[in-house]
Amino acid sequence: MNPLISAASVIAAGLAVGLASIGPGVGQGTAAGQAVEGIARQPEAEGKIRGTLLLSLAFMEALSIYGLVVALALLFANPFV
């Protein structure tokens, strides 16, 4: 295996996980904050807000998992070798 390709794959895997987690992390923080504000304003709508929040958090977390899958593919099933 070419050491340059191996080093680039490790760097790309780290960047894939790091950059794929920035957006969902910010989005999850914002969504959770807005949900807490919504529940504080309308406590009777807590169940509906919480259900919607959990569903949206799952969709956002999927983006981070996709970045992890790309990183694992680069590390263990490298297509460039």
UniProtKB/Swiss-Prot annotation:
List, alphabetically, the InterPro entries matched.
Answer: ATP_synth_csu_bac/chlpt, ATP_synth_F0_csu, ATP_synth_F0_csu_DDCD_BS, ATP_synth_F0_csu_sf, ATPase_proteolipid_c-like_dom, F/V-ATP_Csub_sf
Membrane-protein topology: Multi-pass membrane protein
- What's the domain of life for this entry? Eukaryota
Localization, UniProt: Plastid, Chloroplast thylakoid membrane
Please give one Gene Ontology molecular function term for this protein: lipid binding
Q: Which CDD domains match?
A: ATP-synt_Fo_c_ATPH
Its biological purpose: F(1)F(0) ATP synthase produces ATP from ADP in the presence of a proton or sodium gradient. F-type ATPases consist of two structural domains, F(1) containing the extramembraneous catalytic core and F(0) containing the membrane proton channel, linked together by a central stalk and a peripheral stalk. During catalysis, ATP synthesis in the catalytic domain of F(1) is coupled via a rotary mechanism of the central stalk subunits to proton translocation. Key component of the F(0) channel; it plays a direct role in translocation across the membrane. A homomeric c-ring of between 10-14 subunits forms the central stalk rotor element with the F(1) delta and epsilon subunits.
Q: What else is known?
A: In plastids the F-type ATPase is also known as CF(1)CF(0).
Protein name (database record): ATP synthase subunit c, chloroplastic
Organism this protein belongs to:
Gossypium barbadense (Sea Island cotton)
Organism lineage? Eukaryota, Viridiplantae, Streptophyta, Embryophyta, Tracheophyta
